[in-house]
Each structure stands twice: as structure tokens, then as C-alpha cells.
């Protein structure tokens, strides 16, 4: 049975193994079993690597101290779990302001909306920063077939059972679920994970 993997080092592109690639237009792209994807942000062939990372001296290393701390917000029927480090500012949680507040004034009120509405909002969180418990049981797996989804001018969304292997032990930072986001712009301080820097940098691709 083929196992989907993302394998790379601080100095290499993202190497996707046995993982379908979905373009920003929603169409499945034709790729070999091992596909080299840009993460320096400078390739002229995005989402693919064209070797530019070696020319510009790209180093895909985290710039800050990686620290995962889970915050639990318990309600009557559901517990919201938040991993602040993984948040990349997608903003979907703000669609349910009664529960999650706004970007400038976040809050976590697990009893402020129906459970179904909260769960639906949490499932929109691409980074895995938000998850939930029901009767203290984690609910973190939402996707089936592994796949990579390219966001236009944004990160690479990894969905399904994809194993991440790199030289920074980044897998230890990931949630126990089946989705996370990887930086494509080269500017994240949490590399290889996305921190939302693509927006402020005006990344295109």
C-alpha cells in the first residue's frame, strides 16, 4: 500500500511522495510519484520547484522558538481545543463571531452556538490549530484520501494521512489530526509550517 509522504530538508524543496496534487483551480494536476514543489517562493514554475532555491541560498529553517501549547475551552457538549502556534491566520473562525470573536478580539465560547455550527467552523481551519473534543474524545480526522491542495497566492494544504519527514522534527509540532499547512512563500518564521506571511509579503503563485 502506497504511503503519502512529504520529505525535505532545510535546504531542499518539498518532495511529495505518492500524494495527489490539486491545483488552485480545483483540478488534479498530473505529477510523477515523487514531485518536487517550491517552498522558497521564488520559482518561476510554481507550484513546482525549478532550482531557484539553490541560486538564492534559501534556508528553510524556523526563525523562532517552536512551542506547542494546547488551550482547552470546555462547554456543555463540546470542548474547543486551540493550538496557538499552528494558527496561520486563515480567518475562517471569525465567520462564527459569537464563539470565536474577531481577529483583533478573539474569544472562545463553546456554548454560544449550536454544536453543529461550531464543528463546521472548526473543520474549516486548514492548519489544524483548531480541533474539538466531544465527551473528552478528540475529533481531528476530517479527510479521507491524502492530497495536497495549492492555495492561490497562499500555502500548501496537506489533507489526509500524510507523513511529514524533515531534519527539524517538524512532525512533533503537528496536531494529531489529518491536516496541516506548509509555507510556499519562503517567508514564514515557522518553516516548514505556514504562519500567514504570504499575505503581508504579497506572495503570488
Locations of regions flagged by a protein language model:
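Boundary-flanking segments of nucleic-acid-binding domains in nuclear regulatory proteins
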Residues: 169, 178-180, 192, 201
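Short, structured motif recognition centered on aromatic/hydrophobic residues
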Residues: 14-16, 35-38, 48-49, 130, ...
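Short cysteine/histidine-rich metal-coordination sites, predominantly Zn2+-binding motifs
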Residues: 53-70, 103-115, 138-146, 198-205
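Short Fe-S-cluster ligation motifs
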Residues: 5-13, 17-18, 67-94, 112-135, ...
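A short acidic Gly-Thr/Ser loop motif
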Residues: 39-43, 185-188, 197
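Ferredoxin-like iron-sulfur electron-transfer modules
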Residues: 26-39, 70-89, 101-120, 135-141, ...
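Ordered, small/hydrophobic-rich secondary-structure cores
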Residues: 1-45, 50-56, 61, 76-96, ...
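Iron-sulfur cluster-binding cysteine motifs and their immediate structural context
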Residues: 46-57, 91-106, 122-136, 191-201
